[in-house]
Design a protein with these regions (language model features):
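The feature marks the mature, well-folded catalytic cores of soluble enzymes
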Residues: 1-102
């Protein structure tokens, strides 16, 4: 079972992030924040230690942290997101992950 999770609080720029369903309209930022808080509570209820990163307005999709790193018990692999709006985001997670790996 997982013991640790790293999450990033959605930034207000989330509403201009990448979407595969534009017909649904822009995300509701306040609802996204509530869902994020609920997600954290659910993880904590499962006895997961949650590291919460601050929002980063430069990267609208940065709350989807799983897109920039694949983690295993032995190592973390930093990915290279294809979208131009995500370039540079991977640099921000490298330092955070270093705290979890030798």
């Amino acid at each position: 079972m997982f013991k640790y999770a790293i999450v990033r609080t959605p930034a207000p720029t989330l509403v201009s992030g990448i979407t595969s369903s534009p017909e649904l309209g822009a995300p509701d930022y306040e609802k996204a924040l509530q869902q994020h808080r609920d997600y954290i509570r659910a993880l904590e209820a499962c006895n997961v230690n949650v590291t919460i990163l601050e929002p980063d307005e430069r990267y609208p999709d940065s709350c989807f942290i799983e897109d920039v790193a694949v983690c295993t018990p032995a190592f973390a692999m930093i990915t290279s997101p294809g979208a131009a709006s995500r370039k540079g985001e991977e640099d921000k997670i490298t330092g955070v992950l270093a705290d979890y790996y030798d």
